[in-house]
Amino acid sequence: MVYVELSICFFEEDRIPAVREMILSNTEEQRLISLEKLLPMQIDDFVKIFEVMEGRPVNIRLLDPPLHEFLPSDDETIEELAKSMNIETNDIKKRILDLEEFNPMLGHRGCRVAITYPEIYQMQAKAIIEAAIKVTKEGVKVSPEIMIPLVGEVKELKNIRELVIKTVENTIKEEGLKIDYTVGTMIEIPRACLTADEIAKEADFFSFGTNDLTQMTFGYSRDDAGKFLGQYMDKGILDKDPFQVLDQKGVGKLIKMATKLSKEVNPIIKLGIC
């Protein structure tokens, strides 16, 4: 199986302008125009992936990073963006400032973006299935696994799952083809582990995101923990770096608990780690 991180595609030179226009749009109508530009690019991405994988499972995580990560910080690029969008430079700068976050890892990212801007995940789901339809017509068997990130409350997953399935089914219906697909979630928040029995009722699979789960369980920032983890290991506080070796007592126990809870209500749920 291959695991695909969609956000990487968004940073590519041919699409970052449309991504930025989409993020900085003030209305849903403007966002949809930008998303229409991105749709054929995303379809092409997935066609290539499906063709290379030749029928093997492909797990695709929908957009996860905070939106501000895609925005420019240098004046020259901001001015070019303002010109292309026909907006005052100061207005663009204000919008960029408004999108900045003090703690982005715990902020407006993952499924939270889909709750506030559902059209983004709609576009991505449509791109995945249109690509699947295209390669199916070419004789390549595909069964995409669509993964919704950062779920901590079952109602988040239920809301977005319904959105994704509706988008997918409408697209399939237009083509009159049968495409096998599944919709699941990444388990990376401790609360998701503790309520896995609820979440599993709305998921075809779980993928445990051990990096973020480790960060949120220990309360360590992966980017900053290097400043003290060496001392922790030297002094015997920790035996190993928890970002290199899975912590079995804490993080592992949460995964074990989530596995047990999920299997009790959904015996056929597929479980994995990424």
Language-model segment annotations:
Residues 1-274:
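Conserved alpha/beta-domain cores
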